[in-house]
């Protein structure tokens, strides 16, 4: 071969070789690790001897500037958990992270810088298993009117993606049927007072113990009165308790009436109240009954949604009824009614 031609031929291939563009020949696949574990991320390059090779951490949402971790075979980040190895034979840069934390999750980008605005990149996604955390945009509590349509929403972050389920306090039946509902949104097409109470949103993904949010659902409804014993008998000069149970929300005003006159605490009547969240028990004790106190009494309950009334009739008996007359003097003398005495308890008619 002509010497000049050979020189041109060799020179041509030398120039081509010198101008070959660097490439990233290998990048690690997605990594899924536990908190406290260790991960190694590999990036292999070709034709990059004269170009800077960097590891960067890139925000998953691309809203924060990338964080430089290393350049060439040197670490930039000041974190003892990070280490870097460079294998010259394979041109592989291995980034090691020990004692992985939740904040380490994200994209790790291998970069070969060719020019000011020219670079080659490849990314590996590091996922860190983390327990569920219920999001702020989930329902916290609700106050609704009876008959309304209701949506209870529950969302949770974590990795793997959490599964969301719904339960009620004491495993009560859900409005949708059954004791468990799976899904982010629990829909109640027409809520009733029996649907009120605490609902549990439970998020689980197999990491940790899961997360739970208690959601209080208050249902506004007009008073509903139940009288355990509509007819009660008692002898003259003895006490008797008249009782009514009320369900309502908001809490109702409860009054007792006799002959359309509102009763109050005095020497003839003693009125007591016992309340839970939306259940109320009102008891009126008729003290040392006189003839005029026999008859019909009304328990009245009212809130902004409505009013209800129920009657209790008090009638005269010959023999005192225990309770509440246990231990009271009989017929005005000093003898006391013994618990062993044969007493007559007049049942509801």
UniProtKB/Swiss-Prot annotation:
Propeptide position ranges: 333-349
Q: List lipidated residues, GPI-anchor amidated glycine.
A: 332
Q: What does the entry's PTM section describe?
A: The N-terminus is blocked.
> Per the UniProt annotation, where are the glycans attached?
137
What is the protein's major site of localization?
membrane
The record ties this protein, via Pfam families, to:
I-set (PF07679), Ig_3 (PF13927), V-set (PF07686)
* Disulfide bond positions: 43-110, 154-201, 244-299
Origin species, per record, is Schistocerca americana
Protein's recorded name:
Lachesin
Q: Does the keyword Lipoprotein apply?
A: yes
Q: Which PANTHER family match?
A: CTX-RELATED TYPE I TRANSMEMBRANE PROTEIN, LACHESIN
What role does this protein play?
A: May play a role in early neuronal differentiation and axon outgrowth.
Q: Could you name the Gene Ontology cellular component terms for this entry?
A: neuron projection; plasma membrane; side of membrane
Q: In which tissues is it expressed?
A: Expressed by all neurogenic cells early, but only those cells that become neuroblasts continue to express it. Expressed by neuroblasts, ganglion mother cells and neurons early in their lives, but expression becomes restricted to a subset of neurons as development progresses. Expressed by sensory neurons as they delaminate from the body wall ectoderm. It is also present on growing axons of the CNS and PNS and becomes restricted to a subset of axons later in development.
One annotated GO biological process: cell adhesion
Bilayer topology reads: Lipid-anchor; GPI-anchor
Keywords from the named record: Cell adhesion, Cell membrane, Disulfide bond, Glycoprotein, GPI-anchor, Immunoglobulin domain, Lipoprotein, Membrane, Repeat, Signal
Location of the Ig-like C2-type domain? 132-218, 222-315
Q: Which gene encodes it?
A: LAC
Q: Where is the signal peptide?
A: 1-18
Report the residue ranges that make up the Ig-like V-type domain in this protein: 22-127
Localisation per UniProt entry: Cell membrane
Kindly give the InterPro entries that the UniProt entry links to this protein.
Answer: Ig-like_dom (IPR007110), Ig-like_dom_sf (IPR036179), Ig-like_fold (IPR013783), Ig_I-set (IPR013098), Ig_sub (IPR003599), Ig_sub2 (IPR003598), Ig_V-set (IPR013106), Neural/epithelial_adhesion (IPR051170)
């Amino acid at each position: 071969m002509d010497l000049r031609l050979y020189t041109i031929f060799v020179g041509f291939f030398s120039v081509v070789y010198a101008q070959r563009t660097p490439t990233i020949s290998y990048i690690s696949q997605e990594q899924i690790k536990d908190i406290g574990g260790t991960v190694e991320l590999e990036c292999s390059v070709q034709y990059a001897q004269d170009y800077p090779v960097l590891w960067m951490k890139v925000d998953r949402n691309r809203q924060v500037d990338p964080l430089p971790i290393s350049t060439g075979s040197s670490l930039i980040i000041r974190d003892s958990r990070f280490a870097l190895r460079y294998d010259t034979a394979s041109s592989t840069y291995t980034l090691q992270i020990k004692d992985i934390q939740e904040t380490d999750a994200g994209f790790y980008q291998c970069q070969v810088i060719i020019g000011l605005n020219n670079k080659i990149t490849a990314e590996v996604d590091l996922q860190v298993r983390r327990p569920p955390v219920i999001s702020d945009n989930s329902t916290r509590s609700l106050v609704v009117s009876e008959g309304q349509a209701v949506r209870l929403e529950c969302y949770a972050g974590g990795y793997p993606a959490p599964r969301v389920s719904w339960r009620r306090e004491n495993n009560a039946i859900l409005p949708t049927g059954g004791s468990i509902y799976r899904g982010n949104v629990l829909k109640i097409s027409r809520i009733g007072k029996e649907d009120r109470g605490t609902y549990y949103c439970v998020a689980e993904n197999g990491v940790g113990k899961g997360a739970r949010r208690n959601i209080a659902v208050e249902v506004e409804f007009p008073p509903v009165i139940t009288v355990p014993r509509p007819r009660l008998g008692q002898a003259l000069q003895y006490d008797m308790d008249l009782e009514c149970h009320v369900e309502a929300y908001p809490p109702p005003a409860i009054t007792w009436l006799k002959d359309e006159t509102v009763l109050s605490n005095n020497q003839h009547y003693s009125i007591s109240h016992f309340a839970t969240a939306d259940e109320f028990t009102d008891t009126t004790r008729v003290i040392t009954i006189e003839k005029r106190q026999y008859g019909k009494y009304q328990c009245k309950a009212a809130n902004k949604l409505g009013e209800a009334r129920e009657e209790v009739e008090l009638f005269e008996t010959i023999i005192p009824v225990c309770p509440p007359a246990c231990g009271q003097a009989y017929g005005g003398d000093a003898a006391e009614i013994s618990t062993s005495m044969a007493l007559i308890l007049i049942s509801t008619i």
